[in-house]
Design a protein with these regions (language model features):
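ATP-dependent adenylation/nucleotidyltransferase module used to activate substrates
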Residues: 1-119, 125, 155-163
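Short, basic, helix/turn surface patches
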Residues: 86-98, 135-141, 192-194
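Catalytic subdomain that performs nucleotidyl-dependent activation
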Residues: 106, 113-193
Length: 194
């Protein structure tokens, strides 16, 4: 297997890359990893951080430049979140990149709370019972998508990454986060867990 590890620069994707790299050293199966960051040309994105980190970690990497930010900004209505369209465009770029770089798997950094929040969003906003899965096939592309952190608590990831002192790139660069429905679901889940 050759796994494209999707790296945003956030805590989840960096934690995932670290553990895949550690697993690679001990695994009884042979696999390659390729860290890929999609540079969507968001204003203020610190482009120097990830290449430096990948070199320090001795991880093969590619930075794929795809100016989706402008398209998302133009097509998103005022008061709405960029996240859904931005995510779809980034995912398409990751699929293309996997093909171009000869990868048969894509690793995404979604964790337990992402799964629960997606379930709640589907329930409240679509009337459907469903969430993301730990892995799935994209038959037409010949790809498998995996989520190695699927059952890992977000707090555990945050604590681990903070203890490592890694540079984290915030996910609020585009300025549309205040309208995020996912934030509402996160707050609801926090209330339910108390």
């Amino acid at each position: 297997d050759k796994i494209l590890v999707a790296i945003s620069g956030g805590k989840d994707s960096l934690c995932m890359l670290h553990f895949l790299k550690e697993f690679q050293k001990k695994a009884l199966i042979d696999f390659e990893i390729l860290a890929v960051n999609v540079d969507q040309k968001q204003p203020g994105f610190p482009t120097e951080i990830l290449p430096k980190l990948f070199k320090e970690w001795n991880v093969p990497y590619e930075i794929v430049e795809q100016d989706t930010y402008r398209a998302v900004a133009e097509k998103t209505l005022p008061g709405k979140s960029y996240c859904s369209l931005c995510s779809r465009l980034r995912r398409g770029t990751l699929y293309d990149s996997a093909r171009n770089f000869g990868c048969n798997k894509i690793a995404l950094g979604h964790h337990r709370e992402d799964v629960l929040e997606t379930f709640m969003m589907n329930l409240f906003f679509s009337g459907q019972l469903g969430s993301m899965t730990a892995h799935y096939q994209i038959q037409a592309e010949g790809l498998q998508v995996i989520r190695p952190l699927f059952s890992v608590y977000e707090d555990w990831i945050a604590d681990f990454v903070q203890a490592q002192g890694w540079p984290i790139i915030a996910c609020n660069l585009c300025g549309s986060q205040e309208y995020l429905k996912r934030r509402e679901m996160k707050e609801l889940l926090n209330q339910l867990q108390e």
